[in-house]
């Protein structure tokens, strides 16, 4: 679910007020902290605007007469460039092997057996859960990553979701929160409660999830092999971790299905909407950088509304690459285009 214009501008104005109160020398050096779901909603809204701007569209095409499947397949075969066929990319489906319900009546721990991905980069993760018809129509779900064997110690909030119907539901998880133990075991904790005022937890069935039947929870993971030299690139521009204060690249994978745009964007399935953030100490100032583009629209807006000291060093993109898209235009034509400078690959201090 995306943000409305009012919600988006509310977040931007709140961020502006935060920066003005702190008088930071650079808008990308320390942004106000958003909740994971708030940051995700903002990223999805920015992705919509970035795609529309890159395609010079004011609104998404409305597909009233879908192309016949045979004609669409033939067009895709002719137009799809080799570069759009992801090389060394894999999709992994991992089913929960056990569910521990001993921690609480309405709290469950899901265990997944994942092989350590030392030679691969995890760039997209979704948790699929099945809500049975015996539960209220509206449930509030929260997912946590566990830091200990039975989730009794520290845990990290990953996602929240509100159901409005029974059946399958997909929760997008931050890939950084799915760190497995050396044994490959990953544990996620699920909490749930009803949002219907006429429902009470006392009347809720205890078993929300089941690993024995046809509705087993599962993780959908998208990974790609690390390219030669990727380690050196990561040392120059590390991917942002929660404890990283310095200039780094913050990675977000946007699935067009999550945007509700798979009816008109044919290829690829999604793309990396990355941006740069972090501090630039004096000894890092002057590293090669290029002007930020729409990907850092938040920072650009803040900077335009606040006079920053001359000579201040900011964390900005230093390398970007185009994004190849196959899409249906307003007339139902299949169009192939390369949108320049869409994906940030490296960051540095200006």
From Swiss-Prot:
CDD domains: TGF_beta_INHBC_E
Residue positions with a glycan: 198
SUPFAM superfamilies: Cystine-knot cytokines
Primary site of residence: secreted
Signal peptide span: 1-21
Alphabetical list of PROSITE patterns matching this protein: TGF_BETA_1, TGF_BETA_2
Propeptide positions: 22-236
InterPro entries on file: Cystine-knot_cytokine, Inhibin_betaC, TGF-b_C, TGF-beta-rel, TGFb_CS
Keywords from the UniProt entry: Cleavage on pair of basic residues, Disulfide bond, Glycoprotein, Growth factor, Hormone, Secreted, Signal
One Pfam family per UniProt: TGF_beta
Disulfide bridge map: 240-248, 247-315, 276-347, 280-349
Gene Ontology BP terms: negative regulation of adipose tissue development
Localization annotation: Secreted
GO MF: cytokine activity; growth factor activity; hormone activity
Quaternary structure, from the entry: Homodimeric or heterodimeric through association with alpha and beta subunits, linked by one or more disulfide bonds. Inhibins are heterodimers of one alpha and one beta subunit. Activins are homo- or heterodimers of beta subunits only.
Role, per record: Inhibins and activins inhibit and activate, respectively, the secretion of follitropin by the pituitary gland. Inhibins/activins are involved in regulating a number of diverse functions such as hypothalamic and pituitary hormone secretion, gonadal hormone secretion, germ cell development and maturation, erythroid differentiation, insulin secretion, nerve cell survival, embryonic axial development or bone growth, depending on their subunit composition. Inhibins appear to oppose the functions of activins. Activin E is a homodimer of INHBE secreted by the liver that plays a crucial role in regulating metabolic homeostasis particularly in lipid metabolism and energy homeostasis. Plays a central role in the regulation of adipose tissue lipolysis by preventing the influx of fatty acids from adipose tissue into the liver. Mechanistically, signals via ACVR1C to activate SMAD2/3 signaling, suppressing PPARG target genes in adipose tissue, thereby reducing liver lipid content and improving glycemic control. Induces beige adipocyte formation and thermogenesis in response to cold exposure.
Record-stated family: Belongs to the TGF-beta family.
PANTHER family, per database record: INHIBIN BETA E CHAIN, TGF-BETA FAMILY
UniProt protein name: Inhibin beta E chain
Organism: Rattus norvegicus (Rat)
Organism classification: Eukaryota, Metazoa, Chordata, Craniata, Vertebrata
Gene it is expressed from: Inhbe
